[in-house]
């Protein structure tokens, strides 16, 4: 199977991208904000939904990178962003517009943790590694 490469430039695109990363496992140390580049990136082990296996079957996981451009701010809630052994289960990614194309991207994790990115506009890329 070919590797997945997706880009999200609006809320509908992001819904598709979010579905592909649902139940992904993310290590806290594998998340980083490059302030000078206005980019937030994270590595994950995502469930390979395209393999056609159901939830109850032992599925495959793929290593993937997700990054957001035009990031102006980053805020976390419900987890320690400096935890060297922290592991999070990604549930969903949503976008809430605020002013024009600007808005908030929210990554929701199991257990109530959230990561909020203030962005100039929505631009996200998911790439299997």
List PLM regions with ranges.
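Surface-exposed, interaction-prone regions used to assemble/regulate multi-protein complexes
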Residues: 1-129
């Amino acid at each position: 199977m070919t590797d997945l490469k997706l880009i999200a430039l609006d809320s509908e695109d992001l819904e598709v991208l979010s579905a592909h990363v649902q139940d992904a496992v993310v290590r806290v140390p594998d998340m980083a904000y490059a302030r000078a580049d206005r980019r937030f990136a994270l590595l994950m082990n995502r469930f390979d939904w395209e393999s056609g296996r159901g939830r109850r079957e032992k599925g495959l996981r793929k290593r993937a990178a997700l990054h957001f451009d035009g990031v102006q701010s980053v805020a976390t809630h419900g987890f320690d962003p400096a935890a060297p052994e922290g592991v999070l289960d990604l549930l969903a990614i949503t976008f809430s517009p605020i002013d024009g194309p600007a808005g908030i991207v929210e990554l929701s994790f199991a257990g109530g943790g959230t990561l909020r990115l203030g962005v100039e506009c929505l631009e996200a890329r998911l790439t299997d590694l």
